[in-house]
Amino acid sequence: YYPEAEEALRATEGFKALNSEQQAGILEAFQRNYKAKLNPITEDTMPGELSNVISGRVANAFDLGGPNFTADAACAGSMAAIQSAAKGLLDGDYDVAVTGGVDRTMGIATYTKFCKIGALSPDHSSPFDNSANGFVMGEGAAILVLKRLSDAERDGNKIYAVIRGIGASSDGKGKGITAPNIQGQIRALRRAYADASVDPVEVDL
């Protein structure tokens, strides 16, 4: 509730011309209607306002006691989180990691900005294609539960995939901050192959 809006209403000539009962009725209706437009504010409201609360809320809800933080690396946010989680497992910081990514378009500001800089495709997404002319915004969430392979095998867990290596890079100065730089992508791939001790010629897509 913004008292400034009420003060502006009080200052109008039309409001001043009303008797005290009419003024009180209008102010009461003003506050009631304004508050009706706002969702109740609880501790679950904060993840939508402060990204660093997201991981903390998950830890709180599931009573998790290890380190928790939110990684923001734009499109690579999920990979950055997975890389950090995997490193912590290998370093013995914890035995299980819950990691992943979530993206929601909470308002029109982000959409408008991407439109203004020409980052959004006017028709559709065409990854790895010469006709690519931008990206299409989407929403979604995905969570992975990670363990060291030996621990998962010992505990009889169902194993969906094994992470053999991870590579990351920044594109540096290229076409633009929103456009991929092929050299940066190559660096990431080389680091992933090296981390996994795999020769690229052995990989079949």
Predicted region positions:
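Condensing-enzyme catalytic core of the thiolase-fold
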Residues: 1-205
